[in-house]
Amino acid sequence: DTQMIQHQSGILADVPSQARHLYFALESQEGLQTALEGLSRLADGDSLVVGFGESLVNALGARVEGLRTFPALTGAGVDVPSTQHALWCWLRGDDRGELLHRARELEAALAPALRPVRMAEAFRYGIGRDLTGYEDGTENPEGEDAEAAAIVGAGTEQVAGGSFAAVQHWLHDLNLIQARTQIGRAHV
């Protein structure tokens, strides 16, 4: 009697060629139910993956076991801020113009209860490397191991099929990286 757990397929899919991450703040409880109904019509879990932040879950009077604010981290020469949002929407696709139109549709559906506060465009470079040439994801599990690592399993009815996301924004000093790469090559 194995129950099939449904999840947002975009979580395990390959990185799309283009994407837009939209972050929203809870502006008002009024109209929130209507906004979430609009969101549910647009979110298919593949071309639009969504994540609820702790403030939105609390506003809905719900509780998600394991959901908590990611702590800010500091160390020698390193500051990792913790920027929380009520709602995260990951628009995935192949065409930047189409993503822009879908983002506008999404923002209209969520207003006035949820207000956009940040947008980040993303893209896949080459075979999945970042702009420094580093191939990301080489340590990520694949197949059933990936599903076990990324998708909350059975026995947790409230969140079965869900995932916890920590979305990171990296700023690279490409000039410095290029200079170090050239210096390294000169010494080989």
Task: Give short role names for the model-derived ranges.
Residues D1-H187:
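Long, histidine/aromatic-enriched segments associated with O2/redox biology
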